[in-house]
């Protein structure tokens, strides 16, 4: 973290392991809160944010989620079809918690596998709308009681839960009612 903070990019680490809606303990930032955070007045979120930084000049905040895998993002990635929600959703959470503007969320691939690269998502109106849309899709699935496993082609190759689902989940997914999966399939088309 020291090297990251000394990178000369104008960002200074401010909060580490900032949790919300989780049990408070010594492993989490002192600014953590025991209650979940409500985003957009309707979505209750819980989690832990790896790093919150403050820009030394503009004083805005930036949220960072550390990743250990390969960087599979593209320049246009915002939520990556619902697979990469942290930059946007964690930014919205930090805005709600601090009542301060968050300029961006980013993924920092902090291992050799990820090439020590980062991907930044500016928290502009389009990113906000896209993140909230993803939450709406998830909320509808919960409301309808339909959160069926429906992996995208090749997704099981990188999934930690493959032993739970078994080797044939992709094949089973092709037999599911596409009408019930319409929200999920539309979400996957978002950048």
Located regions from the model:
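RecB-family 4Fe-4S metal-dependent nuclease core
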Residues: 1-191
